[in-house]
Amino acid sequence: MNHEVMNLFNPQAPAQTFDSIRISIASPEKILSWSYGEIKKPETINYRTFKPERDGLFCARIFGPIKDYECLCGKYKRMKYKGIICEKCGVEVTLSRVRRERMGHIELAAPVAHIWFLKSLPGRISTLLDLTLKDIERVLYFENYIVTESGLTSLKLHQLLSEEEYMLAIDEFGEDQFTAMIGAEAIYELLAGMELEKIANDLRVELSETTSELKQKKLIKRLKIVENFLESGNRPEWMIMKTIPVIPPDLRPLVPLDGGRFATSDLNDLYRRVINRNNRLKRLIELRAPGIIVRNEKRMVQEAVDALFDNGRRGRVITGANKRPLKSLSDMLKGKQGRFRQNLLGKRVDYSGRSVIVTGPELKLHQCGLPKKMALELFKPFIYARLDAKGYSSTVKQAKKLVEKEHPEVWDILDEVIREHPVLLNRAPTLHRLGIQAFEPILIEGKAIQLHPLVCTAFNADFDGDQMAVHVPLSLEAQLEARVLMMSTNNILHPANGAPIIVPSQDMVLGLYYLSIVSEKEPGEGMAFSDMGELHHALENKVVTLHTKIKGRVKNIDKDGKEVAKLYDTTPGRLIIGELLPKNPNISFDIVNQEMTKKNISKMIDQVYRHCGQKETVIFCDRIMQLGFSHACRAGISFGKDDMVIPDSKLRLVAETEALAKEYEQQYNDGLITQGEKYNKVVDAWGKCTDRVADEMMKRIQAVEFDPKTGRQRPMNSIYMMSHSGARGSANQMKQLAGMRGLMAKPSGEIIETPIISNFKEGLTVNEYFNSTHGARKGLADTALKTANSGYLTRRLVDVAQDAIISAVDCGTAKGLTMQPIVDAGQIVASLGQRILGRTALVDILHPVSGEVIVEGGVMIEETDVAKIEEAGIQSVQIRSALTCETRLGVCAKCYGRDLARGTPVNQGEAVGVIAAQSIGEPGTQLTMRTFHLGGTAQVVDSSHLEASYEGTVEIRNRNVVHNSEGHLVVMGRNMVILIKDGSGKERVVHRISYGAHIFVDDGDVVKCGQRIAEWDPYTRPILTEVEGYVGFEDMIDGLSVTETADESTGITKRLVIDWRANPRGADLKPAIIIHADKKGEDIAKYKGGEARYMMSVDTILSVEPGAHVKAGDVIARLPMESAKTKDITGGLPRVAELFEARRPKDHAIIAEVSGTIQFGRGYKNKRRIIIEPNDETLEPVEYLIPKGKLFHFQEGDQIEKGDYILDGNPAPHDILAIKGVEALASYLVNEIQEVYRLQGVLINDKHIEVIVRQMLQKVEITESGDSGYIPGDHVDRIELDEINDNLIAEGKRPASGNPILLGITKASLQTPSFISAASFQETTRVLTEAAVSGKIDTLQGLKENVIVGRLIPAGTGGTIAQIRRIAAVRDNLIVDERRKSSDSQVAKIMLTNMTTGATAE
């Protein structure tokens, strides 16, 4: 800001503010300009007087006085001598605070290289000089000479010479014919002599001429660094230092300990070493010591300086007295304990306290109970001020005494002070923004903080000894923000998914559920009640019970606000809950007239919030909590061991399964199935058995029983009530208590074949107990690791997304995403409505039949619109998304849509990036850590058949079926899809049917719910013949490509294809089954214009004999699923991290880049070459190499579409981006990440993941540079490139082009435009080195940079303040310009009059 100009009019201008920070390499002049004097001695303080030594590391003359306004010798004391320099000791009389600010310097006797620019990759010095790092080090550490001028000799420039070679060269050419130097001086000379402009031009010319890719890379790398130096105005020789700055002494203090010893900062040791060696070197040079000694000393100075800047980067680590490595300047910045993360981003807070929490059920939602003792301590300054104002005390000392003695008036004043003064409560770990909320304190006796039960979910708190911290907002602004934004009553909805988070849990749910139960044959059944008074009367007199079926009249208001009453079939309990509902036309009694499970209560609160607003909701929640507690207490629900009912059929089911397992064992012994198949089948059978026992148990537990004596319904099973209501416990836990525990996993994730048949009620046998402890211990170990991993993921997410802030209302983009319901295994997992609610429509959404507009383009889709869209049967909707938003910095409100935590359109300045990161990271601890090893385990076998889950009409897409010899319809296509449509023609379910499956329905058939549609063998993959004919074998040579194997345990033989390439004789074989058209086997049957030849892969089991007659659709060979078994399903947290880091998965899928025909090329030893001949003539054929043992679906001549998988597996996200584009990538990442969370039942809105993916897609890799001055391979911000291209096109120049690239979150964080943010994240030294060389400017746009420089963040209220400041600055500039113009015009007038008067005088 133009403060210089402002000073003309206002001499008392404020301290300079700044808009950006620039980092560059310090020149020697700069270092001297900072310094207040040279440090010549290594001494610190005098051991007798404890005064700093003159010219030493703590010298008072250089750094300033030790005591405020007092020189060292004591001649001048007090304020009146301010600014005088004492003639005796040379110390300036001023504040001692300057010892934190003043720097000194060390003048080096020989230059040294700065280790950051030497060693931090890529080594800047070596790249600039085009030498290897090793060579530079040899010169720097005095092993070799380097030729700096070759003259007319045969020596080359930059040639290295050893001592002998140097001597020989001098003998040969003479000393003055060439120059060779050694040490940092040599490098200094070379760097100083560089003409950067010329080098840059030469490199550009060379780059345009070269064709080798390796050379291009090298040239580009060098050119980048040369250009960085040119643009930033840094000089290369500044990377070699002649003076070293010394940081102020109070930042490396010397602290006296008791016992006369001192604790010192490591830096003092490191500086001392440098000074000692430097002084010794000076003396040696003065004494004209032999070259070899001087050189050794110079090397030692270089090493000392290296250790000071970055200890351990080169050579051995320098250790202190206690064998601990010394902390160098770099270590001061790095890591969790470094300056950035310890002091700048995280600070300790005063006015805070912590204590244990207990429940406070009588509090209102916005209150918390604060112990009096704590309040007295926290609000001390306010109390002192009030005591003074009321005249109880005249000094702070007096006030202090009153407070310490706890005078009665102090308590009255404390009450006044605390009233309406919110405090912040925080529970660690603070995983999302609901971990800190504001409450109004209520003074309580005791020492524990009371917390409102409803906010426990948000804090993830329980009362088993958790502690919480209290913070007092001091300034008026802070109090205002706490009250308006952070009050617990404002945080009713969860920012991750928009569902209520102030929801009753545990006892409250149980109480409400108990109230809402209906029982048969209760007293008073069928009575009718006109109002609540009557009902309470009847309940008091036990005429009816809470669960009696009755009719009740419920009053509500209609749209016009008139009272209406309606009669409902209900129970007294439900009417009592209904009494609390706010009166609103949109809220009917129906939402209470059902069993109040936790889900239903949540829905009810959601409805109340949407229709009645925040205030009503808060009152309603408080009332419902009271009701829940009181009825849970009255009901007295508890359970004993007899409530765990073991089903009678358990023994029968277990016996049946044991028989099955024996049968599979026998089949394996007979050689009908392999070891792996047996394992699969056994695990499968036990899995089914466990589920059936659990089902039987559930049937027993939830059965309605009647008391034969009274005829009344027996009370419901308590355990079932707790589980079913969602209060505590789950079906799985009930299964283990009263069913059977089932299969257990080993620590490796494999499933143990023998299940645990007992349950906890019966008790486990020793073997069973041992089996169950096996996997359980792994679970505990995982939990500890998980917390750390989850926290690290959150940190990376916050870092990458911290500058995504809502910065504009509408960016006006025409791009968006297409949303469809997510279907998994035929079930709709996420409906279209869930996915589009609260998003902005991209274009008008029209009714498919009537064509009327349901939602206009650019308008947010509300709940009512969703209902209309689903009614209309629309299957896909185009919406705006953060991914396609075109705002320059941040995201616009339209693309983001609804602020989930408030249910309204998002405000400007909302930090949506951080919210997204927290929403994704917070549930991280709930995800599993397990990588599922499918040793062909139960998970492979999802199912072996498919049943219709809806009634409707079948439609088959890409139909490709034949009748095989048994008359079954067999699927021959690889992408055949069966859809079931309901009466209105709406798609209900979609199933992809696998190759080789048998189907029982055809196009147009009508199916009933539960009817079997298809089945397949889950344990093997078949190879089918597509034509009828006779089998022939090709290249099937016994012992070479085929072998008859006998199963070792059964002795039964089968034919197996073995790896024929292992033997040199078999190198050219291509084992195949061919189908002949006739019995003689002369000509091969034709199919689709090609021959019916089926290549066999390793491990295929042959199912036919040569000469056998087969029909189309018959199985000729099968591949056991075991070859697909070792696929590890990376689940849970590691999978989420893998996706966000955009790592290439192990064994990733190979995706076709073009549409075309598959051809097989010549294979390699263990790779198979596949060529796609494109359908588009203009494109080149594409080749892929595939490992030979891999399962490969296609035959020669098959058609393949762009984006189809050639090889199955998890695709690499980069491939999806390159082949299918941004939208496909976005939907892939969103769906994959959501799938992991969905498995754990965690709801996260898509938009959060989209915001993170947007941050990962910020960069473009330049392919053609045009006239932009970029170099191909540069990574440029997408929006920056668009702006530069617009300018280039406007000037009629060639624009640059590039491809979008996907960066993992760590990489993206390190590549943010802000170097402060990147340095505080990871790899601090590398980031700062890079930034310094290129002279980067940090414009302080994101949140972290602003926190670090100590400003308000540019989000929320801080964003508004920043905006006001910007507007003010612009206006200031305008005013200054105006004033300057007016003063200029006055001067001009005077000059004119002077000129005219001068002219007339002449």
From Swiss-Prot:
The keyword Transcription applies. Gene3D superfamilies: 1.10.132.30, 1.10.150.390, 1.10.1790.20, 1.10.40.90, 2.40.40.20, 2.40.50.100, RNA polymerase II, clamp domain, RNA polymerase Rpb1, domain 3. SUPFAM superfamilies: beta and beta-prime subunits of DNA dependent RNA-polymerase. Its cofactor is Mg(2+); Zn(2+). GO terms for biological process: DNA-templated transcription. GO terms for molecular function: DNA binding; DNA-directed RNA polymerase activity; magnesium ion binding; zinc ion binding. It catalyses: RNA(n) + a ribonucleoside 5'-triphosphate = RNA(n+1) + diphosphate. Its EC number is 2.7.7.6. Zn(2+) 1 binds at residues 71, 73, 86, 89. Coiled coil: none annotated. Binds 1 Mg(2+) ion per subunit. Binds 2 Zn(2+) ions per subunit. Zn(2+) 2 binds at residues 811, 885, 892, 895. InterPro entries: DNA-dir_RpoC_beta_prime (IPR045867), DNA-dir_RpoC_beta_prime_bact (IPR012754), RNA_pol_asu (IPR000722), RNA_pol_N (IPR006592), RNA_pol_Rpb1_1 (IPR007080), RNA_pol_Rpb1_3 (IPR007066), RNA_pol_Rpb1_3_sf (IPR042102), RNA_pol_Rpb1_4 (IPR007083). HAMAP family: RNApol_bact_RpoC. DNA-dependent RNA polymerase catalyzes the transcription of DNA into RNA using the four ribonucleoside triphosphates as substrates. The RNAP catalytic core consists of 2 alpha, 1 beta, 1 beta' and 1 omega subunit. When a sigma factor is associated with the core the holoenzyme is formed, which can initiate transcription. This is DNA-directed RNA polymerase subunit beta'. The lineage of its organism: Bacteria, Pseudomonadati, Pseudomonadota, Alphaproteobacteria, Hyphomicrobiales.
